[in-house]
Amino acid sequence: VGITVKSGRSVFTYARIPIGTATQELQALAEREYEEVGQKDLDRLNVDWARYGELDAAGKLATFIAKRDGMIVGYAAFIVQTHIHYQDALVAANSAVYAVPEVRAGRVVLKLLRFAEMGLKAQGVQKIYYHVKQTKDFGRLLGHLGYEDVERMYAKVVRDREVG
């Protein structure tokens, strides 16, 4: 189930999908995302599609896509589960969000995130969390959608790199 929107000469479709139905297309986009903002201090990109599939089968994954003229041009994936500190609250934590540069100037990302929010809310999610990379900060867009900047995330690689 999705919605279709005509924008100029293009037709955009926003939908929620089982992740297993589009892993090849999503892999290609994940590689583009990795080139732009990936954590190069870790090993190469190696998406665990099997684990995503397990989460999806367990009802703990929500994957939303934007298509332009039948091709996926953006995605937003969320891990959905009860909050470990508030077990009565179903929450969604954004696992990944990406749109190809060619569609970012329009409202594709805005519409994708709104569609995802509607879908998550319909599922019973009470709170949605996004993590935002400093190198591709879309916090202004999230603020426009009513989200608040509530905490920061810090990271450090603690294992030595293997030389070889």
Regions inferred by a protein language model and the residue ranges of each:
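Short, high-confidence coil segments that cap the C-terminus of an alpha-helix
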Residues: 61, 122-125
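A conserved beta-strand-loop-helix scaffold within acyl/acetyltransferase catalytic domains
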Residues: 40-63, 67-68, 76-87
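A short, internal acetyl-CoA/4′-phosphopantetheine-binding micro-motif in the GNAT/acyltransferase core
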Residues: 95-106
